[in-house]
UniProtKB/Swiss-Prot annotation:
EC nos: 2.7.6.1
Protein name in the entry: Putative ribose-phosphate pyrophosphokinase 2
Cofactor(s) demanded: Mg(2+)
Subcellular location(s) of the protein: Cytoplasm
First-level EC class: transferase
GO molecular function: ATP binding; kinase activity; magnesium ion binding; ribose phosphate diphosphokinase activity
Domain of life assignment: Bacteria
Annotated organism of origin: Listeria monocytogenes serovar 1/2a (strain ATCC BAA-679 / EGD-e)
Keyword entries, A-Z: ATP-binding, Cytoplasm, Kinase, Magnesium, Metal-binding, Nucleotide biosynthesis, Nucleotide-binding, Transferase
Residues reported in the UniProt entry to bind Mg(2+) 1: H131
Keyword Amino-acid biosynthesis: no
CDD domains in alphabetical order: PRTases_typeI
Amino acid sequence: MAGKMKLFSVTSERPLATKIADYLDIPLCEVELQKFSDGEVKINIEESIRGTNAYVVQSMNSNVNERLMELLIMVDALKRASVHSINIIMPYYGYARQDRKARSREPITAKLMANLIQRAGANRLITVDLHAAQIQGFFNIPIDHLSAIPLIGDYLIENYGEKDVVVVAPDHSGVVRARRIADRLNAPIAILNRKPRPHEDEIMSVIGDVKGKVAIVVDDIIDTGVRATTSADILLEKGAVEVIACATHSVMAGNATERLQNSNIKEVITSDSIDLPEDKQFDKLTTISIGRILGRAIEGVQENRSLHPLF
């Protein structure tokens, strides 16, 4: 298998790529990335990869525009090195929240992302918990849409399975995600009824019974942390005994880590789809690795096996 498969990490996800490499028992290929004084990026692959299947790990975290350009340049380098196939492992798909025209004269940037990745020469995308599942339809290449929900669910069963819990969707669009966790915990669900506002949604009511229960709020992304902390405050006000926040992707923009650490949330559970630097770590944070499921997905693609057990 190692002779046919090559694994690369560009810049954003070296720790996760290392875990994937450890699972697959292959080395990470050496990539030299240079940045010129004007910000231009140049990539050089340090070994012959002709005829191989290339797997590139790159999330759209931190500076999403820079990460995207690095990925496109990497894909071009691989194509010109005569690889057999180019498979993108993008745990966190950037611009996913711009998946439709919410108002007139707005772009659909999630679709533009798909166009750029395909036009550059990618043959497949493996991603995790897209903000909007319909983004899969923006591509004309195979998409493997994996989920960290089973891993988060297993952690919750182990640590909160004996408690009286309720799984909370932070809005109506998150009900399906919350239901998947609730089914694993054999727990009821509740929904936060939000009224959209320009800068911060207003929670109008809680649909469901949370009194006396451990409320587990399940989302796909924690960005600024405002949504998670305001959800916790209203749930505690309605009688929840404690609040746990779960999300696959921890963007942690601005002062999110400080906000979450100082909030009424007991624990924040997330995955390593985004590599958080040391200054973004905090005591309440629990990180669950998705390296194994990504490694299994790569194995399945490489060996032409079904990925159904991973969904």
